[in-house]
Regions:
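Membrane-interface "cap" regions at the ends of multi-pass membrane proteins
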Residues: 1-49, 54-57, 73-77, 89, ...
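A generic transmembrane alpha-helix motif of multi-pass inner-membrane proteins
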Residues: 187-188, 376, 381, 385, ...
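Membrane-helix boundary/coupling elements in multi-pass transport proteins
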Residues: 111-124, 233-241, 298-335, 378-379
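Extracellular loop-to-transmembrane helix junctions
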Residues: 3-4, 25-28, 48-143, 254-260, ...
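Membrane-interface loop-to-helix entry segments
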Residues: 141-198, 251-256, 382-391, 402-413, ...
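TM-loop-TM module centered on a large, flexible mid-protein loop between adjacent transmembrane helices
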Residues: 94-96, 133, 252-314, 333-381
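Helix-loop-helix connectors at the membrane interface of multi-pass transporters/channels
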Residues: 94-97, 124-144, 176, 240-244, ...
């Protein structure tokens, strides 16, 4: 998820021009898109959400990430090919509309909006959990309320200078992970004193790699995929490339760098401590270095992630606000959400208000379910993202003239997505997340049916009648 740092801002800007022609010329080079993608894809889902995956499957989480990276590459590659063949600012929702009709574009757009609302809830909860590192007695909902209010205030103040701050904070996140990798390697080689416990050793037996069996490995896939969430937004940003045909190359390099960072850092973390030492309330990288004499690290690392994570959440709020304006502009949401208030820097307050209600829902959930809220929201957000990824793959079958090998690869990508989604049904502690995502899909589906029979068909009939009258 998570939709991420300056990507969310870019998403909003691209969304505002969703009807623009594909002939627009950008000035971004492919390697710049790769670097931006790395910085904005790394989010709180990785710094905290990966802990759930580790506790679910153990050291084999690194293999989960490799499979998720492969699935992500397949999705991005297909999206990049569609972008190169028919560049459109609307990106994946436009292609769903083109392939299957207006109901698909409508469903894709609202599903994406819903997934981002859940991702914001996940980010809000993650920030609150990380803050409890210093203030363990402060209730989760109180932290969530504070972060939500400040985030809304930042959006109300406007976007001036925000992108530059986003880039700096994306760099902070990446630097924090690089810092962990360097320190962890030093620890593995014995350059730091270990305060009790066994020295680091990589598991080399099946039951050590898969302590929860293949069932646990299957269940963990959703969290690995969730960490790669946001790749579809890079598809939107591909419109800014000077050469649109460079989109697949940019995505390949970006995913390669991300996979190396993820696998190396998590591989080091699971090597350094036992499975039982990880906690959902703490970053796995902080947990991994708990037994070493590094008093500064937890505070520096935690602080860096909270600052950057807050920026990511605020950017996501910018993004969902602009996305709803686009849905409204396309006739897929009430016209109310297009309205902008001049007194508030032309900000679409109705659209922001609906996003704020989503944050309020997360706060209420944190109050009612403080123990499991992060697992539930993260799981459901990850599943909703994968539903859109499935839309991307299915759309490619109708839009692209793929060779047989490309079709086989696309089917394999669908199977990986199916495995990740179905794996959430195997573990009762995260199963509610699946049903939450299903509830969203049912609501969106019913809304699409209503729009088809009560709005779109009616508008089509009126247009046909007007056309006939004109001919007469």
């Amino acid at each position: 998820m998570t939709t991420k740092a300056n990507c969310s801002s870019a998403k909003g800007k691209a969304a505002q021009n969703s009807k623009a022609s594909g002939e627009q010329q950008g000035d971004m080079k492919w390697w710049q898109l790769s670097l931006v993608g790395v910085g904005c894809t790394i989010g709180t889902g990785y710094f905290l959400g990966s802990t759930i995956g580790i506790k679910t499957t153990g050291p084999s989480i690194v293999f989960s990430f490799v499979l998720a990276a492969l699935g992500t590459y397949i999705v991005y590659n297909l999206l990049a090919k569609m972008t190169a063949a028919d560049p459109q600012e609307g990106s994946f929702c436009y292609y769903a509309n083109k392939a299957f009709g207006r109901w698909a574009g409508f469903s894709c757009g609202w599903n994406y909006w819903s997934s981002n609302i859940l991702i914001m809830g996940s980010q809000l909860t993650a920030l609150s959990l990380l803050s409890q590192f210093w203030f363990p007695k402060v209730p989760l909902w109180l932290f969530a309320s504070g972060f939500a209010i400040v985030s809304i205030v930042v959006v109300l103040l406007g976007t001036k200078g925000f992108d530059r701050v986003e880039n700096i904070l994306a760099l902070i996140k990446t630097a924090a992970i690089v810092m962990f990798i360097i320190i962890a390697i030093c620890a593995v080689f014995g350059w730091f004193g270990l305060d009790g416990g066994k020295p680091p050793s990589f598991p080399n037996k099946f039951n050590e790699l898969f302590p929860k069996g293949l069932k646990g490995f299957w269940t963990s896939l959703i969290y690995a995929f969730y960490v790669f969430g946001g790749i579809e937004v890079i598809g939107l940003m591909a419109m800014q490339l000077k050469k649109k045909e460079d989109a697949p190359k940019a995505g390949t390099i970006m995913l390669l760098v991300l996979t190396i960072i993820y696998v190396v850092s998590l591989g080091l973390a699971v090597t350094m401590i036992s499975l039982g030492a990880f906690s959902e309330k703490e970053s796995p990288f902080v947990s991994a270095l708990d037994s070493y004499h590094l008093a500064f690290f937890p505070h520096v690392f935690n602080g860096a992630i909270i600052i950057a994570g807050f920026s990511t959440m605020t950017a996501s709020l910018f993004g969902v606000t602009n996305l709803l304006v686009t849905l409204s502009d396309d006739g897929n949401a009430p016209a109310l959400f297009m309205q902008k208030i001049k007194k508030f820097k032309d900000l679409p307050l109705p659209s922001l208000g609906l996003g704020a209600l989503g944050l309020l829902g997360s706060i209420i959930t944190a109050l009612l379910l403080p123990g499991k809220i992060y697992e539930y929201i993260t799981t459901s957000a990850g599943i909703l993202l994968l539903y859109n990824w499935a839309f991307i793959i299915l759309s490619s079958f109708k839009i692209l003239e793929n060779k047989i090998w490309s079709k086989i690869t696309a089917v394999f990508g669908l199977l990986l997505i199916l495995a990740a989604v179905s794996g959430t049904l195997l573990e009762k502690e995260i199963r509610p997340g699946f049903f939450i995502s299903l509830l969203f899909i049912v609501i969106i589906g019913l809304a699409a049916v209503f729009m088809k029979f009560k709005v779109w068909n009616k508008n089509k009939a009126m247009a046909a009648k007007a056309s006939k009258s004109g001919l007469d």
